[in-house]
Amino acid sequence: LEEVDFLDAFTAGDVSGVLIGGSPYDVSTPEGSKTRSQMHVEEQVRELLAVALKEGVPVLATGFGLEVLAGYLGTSTSREFGEELGATEIFVTADGRADPLLADLPQAFTALVGHHEGVGEVPAHSTLLASSPDCPVQMIRVGASVYGSQFNPELDAERFAQRVSAYSDAGYGDPGLVETIVSEASSTSEHMAGRVIRNFVTHFSHD
């Protein structure tokens, strides 16, 4: 990854929006302990966010993406706000209920989570859209079109299990626990958090 330039072919005017997903990396890892790949990826994501904020490119950054966004805005992450693998209740704020990405979600909905660190304070120049008991900053908006989400709306129960399996070396839980969580989550009728992705695409897409 340290050899890949993700922005080499990126032109702001050619895209409707950008999705930045999670990763096994922890932003709060001391700089001296980060791999070259992690440092390069973080740098590339920060550069992309800078372009997006300057050019008005819509972005939805989830998990690791939110943590890099918070750091870019001057707010650190902490293991104090990590969440164990499982389902948690997400509470939409008043600003969130007025936002097009969350407007059709209930005031409280369940999402699958599992992250070592989180953001404890709302970063400067951003609006808090959603929160949870153990992780105060679950979703923010910066400006009109850059979003960060600690939960991963792109992951339904099946994809959540695949992600945990792929990141098993990073300490994301044992297979038995994941199987139980996924079984319980799959019993619900709808992947409610997935509406965030759908609404992002619908609201910002253009030909």
Predicted regions and their residues:
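Alpha-helical elements of Rossmann-like donor-binding domains used by nucleotide-donor carbohydrate transfer enzymes
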Residues: G17, E47, T127, Q162, ...
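Gly/Ala-rich beta-loop-alpha elbow adjacent to hydrolase catalytic centers
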Residues: A61, G65, A70
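Short aromatic-enriched loop/helix-cap "lid" or pocket-rim segments at secondary-structure transitions
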Residues: D14-V15, G32, I140-V142, R159-R163
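Pocket-forming structural segment of enzyme catalytic cores
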Residues: L73-E158
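Acyltransferase
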Residues: L155-D207
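Flexible gly/pro-rich beta->alpha loop and the following alpha-helix that scaffold active-site loops
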Residues: L1-L60
